[in-house]
Amino acid sequence: MIELLFLLLPIAAAYGWYMGRRSAKKDQDDISNKLSRDYVTGVNFLLSNQTDKAVDLFLDMLQKQEIENEIESHSQFEAELTLGNLFRSRGEVDRALRIHQALDLSPNYTFEQKLLAKQQLARDFMVVGFFDRAENLYILLVDEPEFAENALQQLLVIYQKTKEWKKAVNIAEKLAKIKPQENNIELAQCYCEYSQSLEPESAVEKRSVLQKALSVSPTCVRASLLLANLAMLDGQYQQAVKILENVLEQNPDYTGEILLPLKHCYEELNQLDNFELFLIRAGQIINNDEVELALAKLIEEKDGKSAAQAKLYQQLTKKPSTLIFHRFMQYQIDDAEDGRGKESLILLHKMVGERIKQTSPYRCTNCGYQIHKLLWNCPSCRQWESIKPVSNQEHN
């Protein structure tokens, strides 16, 4: 609604000029009062969240002013531009396109006004998915200082939607030069996407691109995971271990994502004891159920189920956890004798498991979107690097 209120500022200006002309030309207080009431009514509709009614009323006011041809040139441009925007806001993009195209082609307006028309015309094309036409307009606007940043942002949106990652990287680099703190995360993610779009045999270029991602965003866990994967494909397991273990310092929230590949590397190196040492160190730094479960599994493989069960029991007494309790119960079931007691354990284990399934393991920290797998771009709010594993506290 706030955006729509700003959108209506030109209407207010045109309306004020129009009312002044009407009052100066003739004594028509009844008409003036009618329009004044309409404007106030429209604002009230907005404030009461009746957006559709407000848009209808403001459209009617603008169209009446246009029909009577009593708006000065500058105000008429703003009014028509806004009229097109209002049509777009209510889904009538074809009418918005006609209005904005007419403004762009009209010989009656200045170069700066036509740039505004081009900007809104590009937005119309974006809404209907004509990305090639929007792209052409935004490329023109990039050369105009007042429009450049917005045009670059929209071009980046287009290239991300069309998955043209080399172009996306080029635009993201320009945005990062303008505002590094706001754009470096997105630039790093564009580097990651571009690296994944390259052919498998382009390993050298992939590494170079991923190193760029880490240079602009040192906490980019995705780049580290991709670099580790490249190292593993080349059989460079010690290098992969170094990269993966660094994630604990990079962003400990993602420690659970490295456990399987890290264990695989240590298995290939025949160094599972070092994997155990890493898990112990990680458990001292962060409270992460996956770390504790991985450690219990390792203890089971080395020393048997009883030792693993004792480890989980110790953990439960310190920090109760649904996930750890669920695994602990499985050990209890394995040891229990047949009978009602075991049946009760199986039922309880199943109920706890169903509760765990209902909890999404990942959540967007920006909009709250929940999902069952890790994505680097939120499908809901389109924010990069905002989806993270749900914490132990949220799980429990």
Swiss-Prot record:
Give the subcellular location: Cell inner membrane
Question: InterPro entries given for it?
Answer: CellSynth/LPSAsmb/PSIAsmb, LapB, Rubredoxin_2, TPR-like_helical_dom_sf, TPR_rpt
Q: Which GO terms describe its biological process?
A: lipopolysaccharide metabolic process; regulation of lipid biosynthetic process
What membrane topology does the UniProt entry give? Single-pass membrane protein
Swiss-Prot/TrEMBL TPR repeat ranges = 35-68, 77-109, 149-182, 221-254
Q: What is its main location?
A: membrane
Fetch the PROSITE patterns from UniProt: TPR, TPR_REGION
Q: Which SUPFAM superfamilies match?
A: TPR-like
Bilayer-crossing residues are 1-20
Residues reported in the UniProt entry to bind Fe cation: C364, C367, C378, C381
List, alphabetically, the GO terms of the cellular component aspect.
cytoplasmic side of plasma membrane
Q: What is its biological role? A: Modulates cellular lipopolysaccharide (LPS) levels by regulating LpxC, which is involved in lipid A biosynthesis. May act by modulating the proteolytic activity of FtsH towards LpxC. May also coordinate assembly of proteins involved in LPS synthesis at the plasma membrane.
The entry's protein name is Lipopolysaccharide assembly protein B
Gene name in the database record: lapB
